[in-house]
Structure formats: structure tokens, C-alpha cells
């Protein structure tokens, strides 16, 4: 009988990037918070101590950081899709979800967030 999927959660990854369409947003980095959920069958990793038997969340996180910090985005939707594409790129991934909060985007609100998901 197959085991339920393992779930990796990258919580509150705080980064700064260029996001938005207003001049101030184009010229100044803004704080964002990224949350990623990844499901994968960890059958080998459950009984192993070999990193090659597990989905390496450090590699995923480093790829997200590199992409977000080295690019500019007009739309939160595009940024969220790009991060989702990174989260789901390993062939073991069966489900991925990304939520990105753009902090202080609206007056009187802590943030505005966008959530996108993908399933194999």
C-alpha cells in the first residue's frame, strides 16, 4: 500500500524584489513573503539517510531566492506563477501551491496576496 505524500512547507520566506507598475514600485524593492507547499512521494526518503532519496528543499529555496531577487515583476500573478514553476519543476512533485504576500500594498491592509496551485 502506498504511503500518503510527504508535504514540504517553506514558510514565510522574506525577500525583496521589484514588484508593481507605479514609478515608486519600479524604482524601489519591496518586501514580499512567500509560502510554498510541495507534495511528493517520499517512499525512499522514509527509510533512508541519503539526500538523493529526498526532494531537496534547500535547492528549491535557493532557486526561488535567485529568481525573485534578480528579476523585476509588474504583476503579482506573474511572480507567483514563476515561483510555482520553480516549486513544481522536480519530476517527483505531485502538487504545489504558492502564496505570495505583497506587504503594505493597500492602505489599511497588512498585505495583498496571490495564491496559485498546480497538480500533476
From Swiss-Prot:
Q: What is its EC number?
A: 5.1.99.7
Q: Name one GO biological process term.
A: pteridine-containing compound biosynthetic process
Class of the enzyme per the UniProt entry, highest EC level:
isomerase
How it assembles, according to the record, is:
Homooctamer.
Q: What happens when the gene is disrupted?
A: Cells lacking this gene show no detectable growth defect on complete and minimal medium. The folX deletion selectively eliminates monapterin production and secretion, but has no effect on the intra- and extracellular folate profiles.
Read off the InterPro entries from this record.
Answer: Dihydroneopterin_aldolase (IPR006156), FolB_dom (IPR006157), GTP-CH-I_C/QueF (IPR043133)
Name of the gene this protein is made from = folX
UniProt catalytic activity: 7,8-dihydroneopterin 3'-triphosphate = 7,8-dihydromonapterin 3'-triphosphate
Task: State the protein's name.
Answer: Dihydroneopterin triphosphate 2'-epimerase
Query: What is the organism of origin for this protein?
Result: Escherichia coli (strain K12)
Top-level lineage group? Bacteria
Q: Which family does it belong to?
A: Belongs to the DHNA family.
Going by the UniProt record, its keywords in alphabetical order are: Isomerase
The free-text function statement in the UniProt record for this protein reads:
Catalyzes the epimerization of carbon 2' of the side chain of 7,8-dihydroneopterin triphosphate (H2NTP) to form 7,8-dihydromonapterin triphosphate (H2MTP). Is required for tetrahydromonapterin biosynthesis, a major pterin in E.coli.
GO CC terms: cytoplasm; cytosol
In terms of Pfam families, this protein maps to: FolB (PF02152)
Q: Is this entry keyworded Isomerase?
A: yes
Q: Which GO terms describe its molecular function?
A: dihydroneopterin aldolase activity; dihydroneopterin triphosphate 2'-epimerase activity; identical protein binding
User: Sorted alphabetically, which PANTHER family does this protein's record hold?
Assistant: DIHYDRONEOPTERIN ALDOLASE 1-RELATED, DIHYDRONEOPTERIN TRIPHOSPHATE 2'-EPIMERASE
Please list the disulfide bridges: none
Amino acid at each position: 500500500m502506498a504511503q500518503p505524500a510527504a508535504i514540504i512547507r517553506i514558510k514565510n520566506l522574506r525577500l525583496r524584489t521589484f514588484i508593481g507598475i507605479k514609478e515608486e514600485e519600479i524604482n524601489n524593492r519591496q518586501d514580499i513573503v512567500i509560502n510554498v507547499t510541495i507534495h511528493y512521494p517520499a517512499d525512499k526518503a522514509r527509510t533512508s539517510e541519503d539526500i538523493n532519496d529526498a526532494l531537496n528543499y534547500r535547492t528549491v529555496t535557493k532557486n526561488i531566492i535567485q529568481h525573485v531577487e534578480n528579476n523585476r515583476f509588474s504583476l503579482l500573478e506573474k511572480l507567483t506563477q514563476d515561483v510555482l514553476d520553480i516549486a513544481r519543476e522536480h519530476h517527483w512533485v505531485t502538487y504545489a501551491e504558492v502564496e505570495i504576500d505583497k506587504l503594505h500594498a493597500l492602505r489599511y491592509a497588512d498585505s495583498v496576496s496571490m495564491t496559485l496551485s498546480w497538480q500533476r
